[in-house]
């Protein structure tokens, strides 16, 4: 039997499918998620149910978003899960997670995310951060390092700034390739994202912050002065106390927000 087949399902490369099979890792992730009935529990990419089954055991209802029609069909006929699941068949990148919110109940979102869409999916989920209590995701280890990086690190970039603007980022555990079927070619890790109820550095317009970060990190080896010359002048960098000869990975989240707010003020 092919090592891409697990529980009768062949992993689909185009969906980035790698199924978690290590019981100890599963237990640790479920413990970190801490499922309960006081939140709207949401799983992205339930796959063959490695996390779905133990989480569903602990709650009355679990909402799942799954793209693969074959896996959706399996979930609809699952002898235990079918009565507890609310299943949305579709692309999580296009899904309106806001429709799942219930007055007085924030979401706990989790999943073993397809590595080929993890970064754009993070950006999509940040749009719903105010309705989310916690997020726990299995990701490529490299992505977790980027999420949790500090200024000056090679991994520090646009994803770092936006993630840490919206959330406290906490790496939970590292997961080796042999914990999956088929085994991915990269190491994996679980991360906890805790959206801020009150942001430490409020931005006047997140769209401006996002654009500024994209522009700054577009050419990482060039200076801020070079990359942002159409957005901020040398005098404005000086007003902010930011050395414009620095490279984008040397600038803190607080400083990126300050730059974005100055751009907003100029537009007003």
From Swiss-Prot:
GO CC field: cytosol
Known function: Specifically dimethylates two adjacent adenosines (A1518 and A1519) in the loop of a conserved hairpin near the 3'-end of 16S rRNA in the 30S particle. May play a critical role in biogenesis of 30S subunits.
Residue sites binding S-adenosyl-L-methionine per the record: 18, 20, 45, 66, 91, 112
Assigned EC number: 2.1.1.182
Keyword flag Ribosomal protein: no
SMART domains the UniProt entry points to: rADc
Superkingdom in the source lineage: Bacteria
Record-linked Pfam families: RrnaAD
Catalytic activity: adenosine(1518)/adenosine(1519) in 16S rRNA + 4 S-adenosyl-L-methionine = N(6)-dimethyladenosine(1518)/N(6)-dimethyladenosine(1519) in 16S rRNA + 4 S-adenosyl-L-homocysteine + 4 H(+)
Taxonomic lineage from the root: Bacteria, Pseudomonadati, Pseudomonadota, Gammaproteobacteria, Alteromonadales
Subcellular location: Cytoplasm
GO MF terms, alphabetically ordered: 16S rRNA (adenine(1518)-N(6)/adenine(1519)-N(6))-dimethyltransferase activity; RNA binding
Species the sequence originates in: Shewanella baltica (strain OS155 / ATCC BAA-1091)
Record family assignment: Belongs to the class I-like SAM-binding methyltransferase superfamily. rRNA adenine N(6)-methyltransferase family. RsmA subfamily.
Entry keywords, A to Z: Cytoplasm, Methyltransferase, RNA-binding, rRNA processing, S-adenosyl-L-methionine, Transferase
Main EC class the enzyme belongs to: transferase
Database matches in SUPFAM superfamilies: S-adenosyl-L-methionine-dependent methyltransferases
Descriptive protein name: Ribosomal RNA small subunit methyltransferase A
NCBIfam families hit by this protein: ksgA
């Amino acid at each position: 039997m092919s090592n891409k087949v697990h529980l009768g399902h062949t992993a689909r490369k185009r969906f980035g499918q790698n199924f978690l099979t290590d019981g100890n890792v599963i237990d640790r992730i479920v413990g970190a998620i801490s499922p309960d009935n006081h939140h709207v529990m949401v799983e992205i990419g339930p796959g063959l149910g490695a996390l779905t089954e133990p989480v569903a055991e602990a709650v009355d209802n679990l909402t799942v978003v799954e793209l693969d029609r074959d896996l959706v069909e399996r979930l609809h006929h699952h002898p235990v899960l079918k009565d507890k699941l609310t299943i949305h068949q579709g692309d999580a990148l296009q899904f309106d997670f806001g429709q799942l919110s219930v007055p007085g109940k924030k979401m706990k979102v989790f999943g073993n995310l397809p590595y080929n869409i993890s970064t754009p999916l993070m950006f999509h989920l940040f749009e719903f951060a105010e309705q989310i209590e916690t997020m726990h995701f299995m990701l490529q280890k490299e992505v977790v390092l980027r999420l949790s990086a500090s200024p000056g690190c090679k991994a520090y970039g646009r994803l770092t700034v936006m993630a840490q603007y919206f959330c406290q980022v906490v790496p939970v555990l590292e997961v080796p390739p042999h914990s999956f079927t088929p085994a991915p070619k990269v190491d994996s890790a679980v991360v906890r994202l805790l959206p801020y109820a009150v942001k430490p550095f409020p931005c006047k317009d997140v769209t401006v912050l996002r654009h500024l970060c994209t522009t700054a990190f577009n050419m990482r080896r060039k200076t801020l002065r070079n990359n942002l010359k159409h957005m901020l002048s040398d005098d404005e960098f000086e007003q902010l106390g930011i050395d414009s000869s620095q490279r984008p990975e040397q600038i803190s989240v607080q400083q990126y927000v300050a730059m974005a707010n100055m751009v907003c003020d100029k537009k007003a």
